[in-house]
Amino acid sequence: MTKNIHDVAYELQKAIAENDDFKTLKESYAAVQADAASKNLFDEFRTMQLSLQQKMMQGQEITEEDNQQAQEVVVRIQQDAKITKLMETEQRLNVVIGDVNKIIMKPLEELYSAQQQV
């Protein structure tokens, strides 16, 4: 009997929510949100990040001023232990999710590489 792919996806969602790195990420995010200075800096970082992504997606040039502002925010971020912990934990979780994505995409990869060998 074939498993419903959506059921498997919901199982994966639950597994991610139960993952230790995800739990640590939630705790780290709550710590950032509870500290006004950290929250303001994190919000500033996210706004800047989204603005730069939007510019790139629209084909707009990232100016030297944009780069300078981004560097200044990054320096301040690195000095905030709460945000640093949040970002390190998020990076670990992103590695796990990337690994899972590779596993999920393996059938397509095999299909297309088999087609190229024909």
Swiss-Prot record:
SUPFAM superfamilies: YheA/YmcA-like
Source organism of this protein record: Bacillus anthracis
Family: Belongs to the UPF0342 family.
Protein name, as recorded: UPF0342 protein BA_0863/GBAA_0863/BAS0820
